[in-house]
């Protein structure tokens, strides 16, 4: 069977120093010799003086150029551009303030020119006012005359009605009183006469009837008496009274002289028809004359009131002040301080913003310089770690190297964070991709440009809003004072003309007012009131004469006279009082003009001065150009800031879109794809490579990582756990040399392609070494990503996958490593990782839960603490042969275990030492490899027991057994590269969780608990920190070379010596003790 050769390295013969050959695999880390160590001359690299006097340039940037380039970092460029914009806005604001002040003064000058025109306004206003006043006055005179004529006509009708009413009332009253009285008297006289006659006749009849009745009564009584007396025969007779005639009472009457007088008076009463005609003539004559006089007077007065009697201001008064003088008067003390104050406030705001931006620029630059220094340091440590790994292990994943070098800070600090929030390796890998995506220079530049720019502009806008409110309030008060002053000056310019015009107009109106009072109301009062009064007096006199003629000398004269005064006389008296009041109040007052008739009102003047106020603070009507000079000044500054804010906001939105795209990709690859496929009914085989179940045709476990690993020691850990062999070892006549994975597969997720979870443990280093600590911390994410499983996260095979058989063997693990193709199950948590991924937030929850659990001691830590408390310091004797990490044969690892093993030829063994001890003289006389003695000889040699590391519940890598190392006859030259063996330890794998940190701290605690001396096969980071007193050798099989190849002479002697040791009895076994 042929073995592929590793690519040969070019070795310059001039650089080879005798006795110090370059390190060659596989003997760089493995050596075996029974002889004492041979002193070596330390190999020293050429001193810098041999190379060159000057340090040449490298194909990469060192620290100083990187710090120099931070001045133009994408984080600083937006701030520099923002500062430039602020400086430009500040200069443009100052120039705009000067321009706006000029515009306000120009507006005031224009108003002054308009005010000069306003001074000419009173003449033209007076002319127009005169025309309207003449028209109104003429109409008023005519209307007053017409009103007076109508009033007089109405009064005439009313007087006639009143006079006729009282005349008719008087006549009717006389008819009612006199004729009624007379009729009553005549009727009474006749009734009395008839009553007297009837009464006397009735008396006569009654007397006669009474005498007749008396006679009858007497006769009746006598008759009754006689009937009684007839008994005695006695009759009484009484004589009757005679009835008188009484004829003188029958024709008695009253004399008719009085009655005849009353009848004559009733027929002789007057009708007052002549009085009515006379009164109508007396009333109508004066009223008709008054109406005619008023009509002629009103027409003459209306015609005489024209424009000739009203004056107007002359144009000569305008030459006193020119327009320029008026402009100086109006605009000389115009307050424009509000513009200056606003400009100064904006300038101060810009200066403060620029200063803060410069300060922030310096702070960010300092932070970037520190960041670049830290990044450079981490990058150097990473490069050193990668070089060391590559020198020891060969090439690995170059793309992983790119990720580490691009983002060394993320590699250093993201492991703990991602390990706490994500439980599954796939989720951690996706989140690591997301962080790299966000940390890309383009994405970072976009974020910093948009964020810094947006925040700086927004802070300025907030300060500008407060400044705008203060400027507006100050501008309003200033403009109000300026407007009041301007209105006062404009009114003072037109006050004289208005006063002259008002005086001339009022004089003309006063003359016509006198004419109206004297000619219209005077004639009416003098004529109508006096005439009417005399008419009423004459009317009353005529009525009294008629009553005197009719009732004079009678008993009715006084009642009738009193009644007439009550009915008519009192009314005439009240009418005379009314006429007297009219005479006293019959005049008119025509309205006159005030002295400011030609001046504009305050509202009008404010309206004229509004343009200046609008130019200063805006009109306030909500238009586009109503902000005024102050608003324009602030709006100019604000608009520039808003344009920049919009630009930065768009850039921030683009970054958010990129953020969401990256987040969607992470969610899709963290379980979203599986859910989508499940919803569509797609089989699970459509899962991404490396995350689905293992396929049988491509084994996922490397054969050389299992039972036939050349460095695989499961002895001590099996004995500590108390397990027994589950199967018998089989003899293998050959073993393949493990290959070096060059990492060409694009689907590989790990930086170092670990073929075994034991080999993926963190490599020990000195605790005081910052470089080694950094290397280990950078390598920790890869270790955690593989979860110490040793699986390759891809289904593609390497050139050796199909050539190396899989065989179940005993290991230090509790379960078989052949999970894919072995009948032995592996019910560990790692097998669940190949199932369908949990959702991202579920993983995040479990990750947080695991992070909390990490603060508490683990089970292994508690057990170790219990061992430290309850047991003394363990030695080789206390642990027994099964706990001593010494060289053992497979057949003697277990008591009785060799009975189930097939017989096979004993094979030699050889020791593995630390490669760092090469070329170092050992202090012990026993040499590099002390011989293992029986207990009796150890006691005789003053052997002191020493503490060893029992590795409780350890998951660290151990040395396997059972794989044959073939001899390589194809490389007779010892200086030529040999096919490499897999290293005993893998240094700090690169992944993103805290497994390395926890294992590092746990190993440190265990080392301190056990004295600091551990097995070289353990994962303790402090192994090389102390010189062990006993170097235990792990067993490997050094078999016969394949295809008849011959090993070197030195190798043959080593094999022979190891074979002799193998044939010895176990000095720590029961058989050996019985033999003693």
From Swiss-Prot:
Residues 874-886 have a biased composition (Polar residues). It is found in: Cell membrane. Residues 1-31, 796-834, 874-899, 963-1020, 1057-1076 are annotated as: Disordered. Keywords: Cell membrane, Conjugation, Glycoprotein, Membrane, Transmembrane, Transmembrane helix. Residues 997-1010 have a biased composition (Basic and acidic residues). InterPro entries: PRM1 (IPR026777). It is a multi-pass membrane protein. The keyword Transcription does not apply. GO terms for biological process: plasma membrane fusion involved in cytogamy. It comes from the Eukaryota. Residues 88-138, 372-432, 668-1076 are cytoplasmic. Glycans are attached at residues 235, 251, 266, 295, 306, 476, 496, 526, 533, 548, 602. Disulfide bonds: none annotated. GO terms for cellular component: mating projection tip; plasma membrane. The keyword Zinc does not apply. The chain crosses the membrane at residues 67-87, 139-159, 351-371, 433-455, 647-667. Residues 1-66, 160-350, 456-646 are extracellular. Involved in cell fusion during mating by stabilizing the plasma membrane fusion event. Belongs to the PRM1 family. This is Plasma membrane fusion protein PRM1. It comes from Cryptococcus neoformans var. neoformans serotype D (strain JEC21 / ATCC MYA-565) (Filobasidiella neoformans).
């Amino acid at each position: 069977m042929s073995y592929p050769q590793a690519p040969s390295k070019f070795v310059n013969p001039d650089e080879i120093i005798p006795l110090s050959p370059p390190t060659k695999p596989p003997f760089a880390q493995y050596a075996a010799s029974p002889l004492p160590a041979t002193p070596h001359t330390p190999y020293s690299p050429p001193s810098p003086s041999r190379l060159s006097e000057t340090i040449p340039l490298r194909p990469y940037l060192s620290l100083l150029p990187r710090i120099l380039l931070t001045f133009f970092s994408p984080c600083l460029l937006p701030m520099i551009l923002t500062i430039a914009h602020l400086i430009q806005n500040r200069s443009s604001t100052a120039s705009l303030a000067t321009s706006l002040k000029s515009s306000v003064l120009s507006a005031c000058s224009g108003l002054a020119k308009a005010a000069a025109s306003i001074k000419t306004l009173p003449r033209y206003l007076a002319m127009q006012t005169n025309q309207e006043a003449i028209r109104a006055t003429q109409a008023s005179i005519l209307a007053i005359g017409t009103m007076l004529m109508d009033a007089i006509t109405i009064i005439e009708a009313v007087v006639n009605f009143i006079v006729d009413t009282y005349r008719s009332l008087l006549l009717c009253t006389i008819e009612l009183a006199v004729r009624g009285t007379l009729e009553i008297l005549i009727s009474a006289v006749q009734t009395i006469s008839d009553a007297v006659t009837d009464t006397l006749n009735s008396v006569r009849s009654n007397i006669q009837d009474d005498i007749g009745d008396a006679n009858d009564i007497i006769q009746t009584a006598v008759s009754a008496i006689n009937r009684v007396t007839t008994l005695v025969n006695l009759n009484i007779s009484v004589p009757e009274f005679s009835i008188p005639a009484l004829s003188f009472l029958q024709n008695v009457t009253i004399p008719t002289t009085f009655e005849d007088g009353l009848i004559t008076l009733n027929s002789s009463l007057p009708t007052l028809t002549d009085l009515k005609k006379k009164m109508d003539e007396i009333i109508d004559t004066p009223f008709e004359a008054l109406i005619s006089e008023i009509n002629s007077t009103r027409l003459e007065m209306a015609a005489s009131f024209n424009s000739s009697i009203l004056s107007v201001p002359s144009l000569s008064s305008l030459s006193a002040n020119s327009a320029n003088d008026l402009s100086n008067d109006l605009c000389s003390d115009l307050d424009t301080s509000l513009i200056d104050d606003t400009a100064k406030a904006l300038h101060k705001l810009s200066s403060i913003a620029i200063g803060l931006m410069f300060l922030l620029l310096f702070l960010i630059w300092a932070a970037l310089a520190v960041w670049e220094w830290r990044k450079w340091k981490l990058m150097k440590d990473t490069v050193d770690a990668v070089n060391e790994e590559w020198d020891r292990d060969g090439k690995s994943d170059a793309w992983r190297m790119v990720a580490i070098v691009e983002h060394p800070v993320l590699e250093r600090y993201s492991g703990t964070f991602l390990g706490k929030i994500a439980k599954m390796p796939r989720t951690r890998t996706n989140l690591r991709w997301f962080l790299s995506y966000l940390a890309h220079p383009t994405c970072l530049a976009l974020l910093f440009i948009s964020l810094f720019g947006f925040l700086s502009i927004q802070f300025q806008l907030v300060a500008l809003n407060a400044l705008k409110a203060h400027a507006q309030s100050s501008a309003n008060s200033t403009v109000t004072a300026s407007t009041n002053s301007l209105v006062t000056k404009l009114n003072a310019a037109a006050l004289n003309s208005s006063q002259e015009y008002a005086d001339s107009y009022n004089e003309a109106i006063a003359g016509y007012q006198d004419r109206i009072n004297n000619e219209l109301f005077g004639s009416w009062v003098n004529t109508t009131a006096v005439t009417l009064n005399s008419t009423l007096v004459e009317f009353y006199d005529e009525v009294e004469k008629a009553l005197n003629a009719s009732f004079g000398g009678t008993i009715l004269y006084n009642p009738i006279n009193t009644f007439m005064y009550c009915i008519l006389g009192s009314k005439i008296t009240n009418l005379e009082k009314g006429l007297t009041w009219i005479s006293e109040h019959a005049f008119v007052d025509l309205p006159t003009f005030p002295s400011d008739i030609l001046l504009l009102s305050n509202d009008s003047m404010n309206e004229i001065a509004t343009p200046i106020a609008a130019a200063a603070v805006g009109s306030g009507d909500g238009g586009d150009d109503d902000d005024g000079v102050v608003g324009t000044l602030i709006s100019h500054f604000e608009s520039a800031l808003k344009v920049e804010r919009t630009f930065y906001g768009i850039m921030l939105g683009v970054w958010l879109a990129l953020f969401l795209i990256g987040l969607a990709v992470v969610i899709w690859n963290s379980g979203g794809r599986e859910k989508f496929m499940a919803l569509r009914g797609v089989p699970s085989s459509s899962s991404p490579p490396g995350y689905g179940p293992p396929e049988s045709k491509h084994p996922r476990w490397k054969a050389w990582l299992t039972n036939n690993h050349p460095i695989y020691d499961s002895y001590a850990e099996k004995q500590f756990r108390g397990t027994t062999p589950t199967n018998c070892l089989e003899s293998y006549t050959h073993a393949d040399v493990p290959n070096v994975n060059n990492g060409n597969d694009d689907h590989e997720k790990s930086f170092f392609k670990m073929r075994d979870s034991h080999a993926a443990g963190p490599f020990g280093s000195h605790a005081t070494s910052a470089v080694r600590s950094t290397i280990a911390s950078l390598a920790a994410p890869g270790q955690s990503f593989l979860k110490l499983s040793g699986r390759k996260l891809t289904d593609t095979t390497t050139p050796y996958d199909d050539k190396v058989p899989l065989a179940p063997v005993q290991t230090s693990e509790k379960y078989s490593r052949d999970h894919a193709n072995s009948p032995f199950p592996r019910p560990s948590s790692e097998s669940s990782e190949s199932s369908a991924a949990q959702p991202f937030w579920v993983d995040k929850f479990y990750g947080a839960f695991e992070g909390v659990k990490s603060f508490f001691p683990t089970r292994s830590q508690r057990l170790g603490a219990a061992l430290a408390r309850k047991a003394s310091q363990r030695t080789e004797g206390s642990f027994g042969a099964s706990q001593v990490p010494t060289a053992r044969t497979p057949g003697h690892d277990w008591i009785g275990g060799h009975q189930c093993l097939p017989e096979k030829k004993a094979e030699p063994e050889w020791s593995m030492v630390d490669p760092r001890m090469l070329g170092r003289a050992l202090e012990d006389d026993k040499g590099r490899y002390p011989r293992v003695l029986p207990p009796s000889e150890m006691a005789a040699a003053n052997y002191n027991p020493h503490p060893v590391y029992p590795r409780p519940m350890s998951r660290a890598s151990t040395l396997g057994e059972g794989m044959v190392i073939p001899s390589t006859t194809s490389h007779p030259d010892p200086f030529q590269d040999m096919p490499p063996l897999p290293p005993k330890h893998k240094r700090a794998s690169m992944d993103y969780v805290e497994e390395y940190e926890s294992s590092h701290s746990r190993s440190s605690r265990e080392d301190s608990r056990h004295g600091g001396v551990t097995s070289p096969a353990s994962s303790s980071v402090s192994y090389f920190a102390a010189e062990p007193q006993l170097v235990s050798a792990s067993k490997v099989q050094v078999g016969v070379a394949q295809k008849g190849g011959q090993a070197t002479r030195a190798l043959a002697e080593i094999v022979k010596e190891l074979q002799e040791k193998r044939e010895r009895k176990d000095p720590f076994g029961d058989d050996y003790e019985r033999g003693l």
